[in-house]
Each structure stands twice: as C-alpha cells, then as structure tokens.
Amino acid sequence: MHIRILGSAAGGGFPQWNCNCRNCRGVRDGSVAAQPRTQSSIALSDEGERWILCNASPDIRAQIAAFPALQPARRPRDTAIGAIVLLDSQIDHTTGLLSLREGCPHEVWCTQMVHQDLSEGFPLFPMLSHWNGGLRHRPIALDGEPFAIPACPRLRFTAIPLRSSAPPYSPHRGDPHPGDNIGLFVEDLDSAGTLFYAPGLGEVDEALLEWMRRADCLLVDGTLWRDDEMLVCEVGDKLGRQMGHLAQSGPGGMLEVLAKVPAARKVLIHINNTNPILDTASAERAELDASGIEVAWDGMHIQL
C-alpha cells in the first residue's frame, strides 16, 4: 500500500493567510524552524498507478502539481484519481471537489450523513451535477464490514464511526450522529500492511483502541498540542474538544493514547498552525521524537 501525504495542516493551512501567531509569523520571516504545509489530504494506492483521494482539500490543485503520479499522463485530459473518499463534510476536506469539476464524473464514497450535509448545508452534490455527471455517490455503510473500491481492488476499507463534530454549517452541529465523522482501517491484501487513518478524532474509547492496535501505521489527528491552545494563542474562543479534536498533551490526550498502541509507525496529521510541534526546535517536538511519534509533512510517502 502506497500512502502519499498531500497535505498535513489543519484548516487554513500553514501559515494561515490571516494569522500572525508565533508559528505563522515565524515561518514567514524564517525565525521558526518549520516548513509550510497545505490543508489535510492523503492519497492511497495498491500498485502506485490508480489512486484513491481521501478528502479533497482546498489546496488540491497545488497538491496535484507537487505529485506527478496524480498528473495527466495517458490522454489529453486525464487523472490517476480513481475515486474520492470523504471522512467528513468539513469545509477543509471537501472544498477541493469544486476544483476537480473538470474531471467529473467522480465516484465519491461517503456516509449518508456526509452526503446529506453536502446536498443541503453545503450543496456540492447538486451544484456539481451540472459538470458532466457531477459526483456519483457511493454510500459507506457503518456496519463494520470491509468494502472494496474498484480503482484499487487490492485494498480493503472499513469505516469506523468516530466521536467528533459535524461542521459549523451542519444543521446537526450540536447533535452528533453516527457517520458525521469516520476513521478508515485500510488493509492491503497482498502485503497484509494495515493503516488506521483518522484526521479528525475527538475521543478514543476501548473499541476504537482495538482498531488502532491492529494497524501497522497510525495516521491520526494532530490538530492541537493543548486543549485551550486557540484561547492561549488569542486566535479563537473554543477548546479543542469543542471542535472535535483530541489534544496531544494532558490527561487522556493523544500522547497517552498512542503509548497504548504498538504500531510500528505513529504519525500526526491535520496540524493546526498554532501547534508548537510544527517548530522542529520546540520542546514539544522533542517530546514527540522521544516517544517515537512522527509529524506528517507535505510530500511524505509511506509504504506498507
């Protein structure tokens, strides 16, 4: 299984266009040892020819430009993107569909709740129906059964409902439903390599831990270092848990969770611009290094 990190930042990217926090200011003027990042998205492939896009970032055009394997190479108009999987209906995970309209029709796999949000609150499905057939919805069931996507037939996907939040525009933002957010457990039938992918993760219970323990590689929510980070940095008024993100530090935080899991690789993705782990010289980054936890970067390639 080939895993390409197309984008590793949370919504807004890094640096965020209107943010003057220490990290964003520092990456612009070179005073912080950090590299810019686009908004979170990955691509998966079984053989490296056809790819499945997991979430469609607003930065998708730049991400394709940085990854030749997704670029047109066989016909005058062409793409190696064989399908798109949406793990939620967040703006920073779906807006890229607008930039992919010239390649319609696209197979878009998502839960019924995500499809509802993208048909009503942020109506991408009806909007894009005017472009060559638009988006063809392929439902993702929440029954725990593995499913295959024809573009990469040697991969098996299992959707895992997560405790997180629907996007702010959703009519059930404050009333969570199963399927608002999912994680993916992905298995390569040939190599037997396994991935657990959850860029938006608000809570980890024992059942979810069991899925995480089965994975060779964890690619999980790295949004915030501390739950009150947005308030401390004076860039927001919400706690991480109110936004559906489990902070890395503190009791029950992601560091404690990952310490319970034997995966060979533990990688944080969807990293907010305020998070001190973006600074490679920070004490927080040193703590991750000492724990064997990696920080995803744009262009990172993992093979399982």
UniProtKB/Swiss-Prot annotation:
Q: Which GO terms describe its biological process?
A: pyrroloquinoline quinone biosynthetic process
According to UniProt, the name of this protein is Coenzyme PQQ synthesis protein B
**Which pathway does the UniProt entry assign to this protein?**
Cofactor biosynthesis; pyrroloquinoline quinone biosynthesis
In its UniProt entry, the species of origin is given as: Pseudomonas aeruginosa (strain LESB58)
Q: What does this protein do?
A: May be involved in the transport of PQQ or its precursor to the periplasm.
Q: Which InterPro entries match?
A: Metallo-B-lactamas, PQQ_synth_PqqB, RibonucZ/Hydroxyglut_hydro
Top-level division of the source organism's lineage: Bacteria
What are the entry keywords? PQQ biosynthesis, Transport
- What gene codes for this chain? pqqB
For the keyword Transport, the answer is: yes
